[in-house]
Amino acid sequence: MSTGSLSDVEDFQDMEMLECDGIKLDPNKEFGISNDSNEESSTCDNGSPKKGRGTSGKRRKASSKKSPLGTINQEGKQVQRNAANARERARMRVLSKAFSRLKTTLPWVPPDTKLSKLDTLRLASSYIAHLRQILANDKYENGYIHPVNLTWPFMVAGKPENDLKEVVSTSRLCGPTAS
């Protein structure tokens, strides 16, 4: 849109002809006006963009002719956008497969059941909590401490230091004997 500044007048004087798909058009001819929006361009008869006049009848400031660098830059952006879209689709495929595998490993979910990702995570979390509870009930059986009951650096979770020394000296960690 014209701002009425001096640079607009200079742009009018510099612009003798407009180009639409390689065809030179006289800027004095009437062009189609876009009623939808305040876009700088409307379309030629063949559907390609061309410069037009605004609703006030004044010419709008024409953008500079496309240079080869501008075209290359736009093509580069399109290539980057396509690559980013492909990466996102691949990421979503991997995520979807992971949720599918997780759903099939849950023992009480029938295979034909449709679950949202949130429901799958909730069921998996409750299943893990159930398994932890089973292990917690058996944690001192046979003198072993299961790794699920250990915290970094391999201390029995929730035990005071005095009790811990007794448990470690009388129990064996999973794997080789701890000393």
Curated annotation (Swiss-Prot):
Keywords from the named record: Differentiation, DNA-binding, Nucleus, Transcription, Transcription regulation
Region feature Disordered, mapped onto this chain: 20-86
Single GO molecular function: DNA-binding transcription repressor activity, RNA polymerase II-specific
Tissue specificity comment: At the start of neurulation (stage 13), expressed in the pronephros. At tailbud stage (stage 25-28), expression is high in the anterior-most branchial arch and pronephric glomus. At stage 40, staining persists in the glomus and in the epicardium region of the heart, and at stage 42, expression is higher in the glomus than in the kidney tubule or duct. In adults, expression is highest in the rectum and the spleen, with significant expression in the duodenum, heart, kidney, lungs, pancreas, skin, liver and muscle.
Disulfide-linked positions: none
Gene Ontology CC terms: nucleus
Biased composition (Polar residues): 34-46, 70-80
Gene: tcf21
Metal-binding among keywords: no
Subunit text: Efficient DNA binding requires dimerization with another bHLH protein.
One matching Pfam family: HLH
Function: Involved in epithelial-mesenchymal interactions in kidney and lung morphogenesis that include epithelial differentiation and branching morphogenesis.
Record-annotated bHLH domain positions: 79-131
Regions of compositional bias (Basic residues) in chain numbering: 50-64
Keyword Transcription regulation included in the entry's annotation: yes
Name recorded for this polypeptide: Transcription factor 21
GO terms for biological process, alphabetical: branching involved in ureteric bud morphogenesis; branchiomeric skeletal muscle development; bronchiole development; developmental process; diaphragm development; embryonic digestive tract morphogenesis; epithelial cell differentiation; gland development
